[in-house]
């Protein structure tokens, strides 16, 4: 199964020839229901109005569309807070929406409210699933217990047995968060699968502190600067519009430091770079999950597979 929150990415995956089932990770917008049915096989849902629209559109397109109902277990993003309402909604989907297939239940933990995917939290989801199963008289296909933040429960053997689907992104794409934040040994994973490459467009020695009256930057912030004297700097032809924050990109070249950025420029301190850096050079950077999300959604960034 391939999953994305963006229908555009799902369409791209299909155009690349991927024939695996497609899951829409973000609950659908009402305005995109026709595309949800056209492009995806499964979607996460929490609103009766959207479910009815999906059912109607699936019938129009001659399809059966699977849905996973989302439970909010405290992270306070999407999902039913009232669990009795969720059970009744599941029964309604099962009995009254002939073009939808009630595939399972799911939850999100950690992405907004920073709530840990504890065994107790995940067991709450299992209890909801079993309440639904008792009402509809069959076993649900999926109990989806979160995303990368739920992987530690697999590593420590405390994942409830009935949880059989995780919507994992960072944990397989980069595998850095589990190491950094949870202390898990991820040495078996390649953590350098993605490389950001950017071209140097200027190299000059300049003061390290702006000269003049400091006001606000292009994003309305009032940064602080450290005066380190005259330093050799390089500009890159890429900026915050492309990757988000300078805190999420890491130069591979020794002695190179990212010191700032605007929308379309990134400023490096190269005074102590291990090698000479010239205009036209291509510099490589490691990236974190946030910058990966920005970069892969930016149409200005060329993505090369090797």
PLM segments and residue spans:
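Active-site-proximal beta-alpha core segment in soluble small-molecule metabolic enzymes
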Residues: 1-130, 135-136
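Active-site anion/phosphate-binding pocket segments in diverse small-molecule metabolic enzymes
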Residues: 122-306
């Amino acid at each position: 199964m391939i999953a994305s929150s963006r229908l555009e990415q799902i369409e791209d995956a299909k155009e690349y020839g991927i024939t695996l089932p497609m899951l829409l990770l973000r609950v659908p917008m009402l305005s995109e229901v026709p595309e949800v049915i056209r492009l995806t096989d499964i979607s996460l849902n929490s609103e009766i109005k959207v479910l009815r629209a999906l059912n109607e559109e699936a019938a129009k397109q001659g399809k059966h569309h699977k849905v996973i109902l989302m439970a909010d277990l405290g992270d306070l993003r999407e999902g039913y807070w009232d669990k009795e309402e969720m059970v009744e909604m599941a029964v309604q989907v099962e009995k009254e929406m002939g073009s939808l297939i009630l595939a399972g239940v799911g939850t999100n933990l950690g992405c907004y409210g920073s709530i840990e995917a504890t065994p107790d939290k995940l067991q709450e989801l299992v209890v909801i699933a079993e309440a639904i199963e008792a009402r509809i008289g069959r076993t649900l296909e999926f109990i989806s217990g979160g995303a990368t933040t739920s992987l530690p429960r697999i590593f420590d053997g405390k994942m409830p047995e009935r949880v059989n689907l995780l919507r994992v992104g960072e944990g397989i794409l980069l595998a850095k968060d589990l190491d950094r934040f949870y202390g898990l040994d991820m040495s078996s994973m390649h953590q350098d699968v993605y490389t950001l490459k950017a071209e140097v467009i200027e190299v000059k020695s300049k003061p390290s502190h702006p000269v003049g009256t400091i006001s606000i930057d292009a994003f309305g912030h009032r940064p602080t600067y450290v005066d380190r004297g005259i330093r050799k700097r390089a500009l890159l032809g890429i900026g915050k519009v492309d990757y988000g924050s300078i805190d999420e990109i890491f130069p591979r070249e020794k002695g190179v430091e990212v010191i700032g950025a605007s929308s379309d420029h990134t400023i490096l301190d190269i005074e102590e770079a291990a090698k000479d850096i010239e205009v036209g050079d291509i510099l490589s950077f490691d990236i974190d999950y946030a910058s990966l999300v920005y970069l892969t959604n930016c149409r200005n960034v060329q993505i090369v597979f090797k």
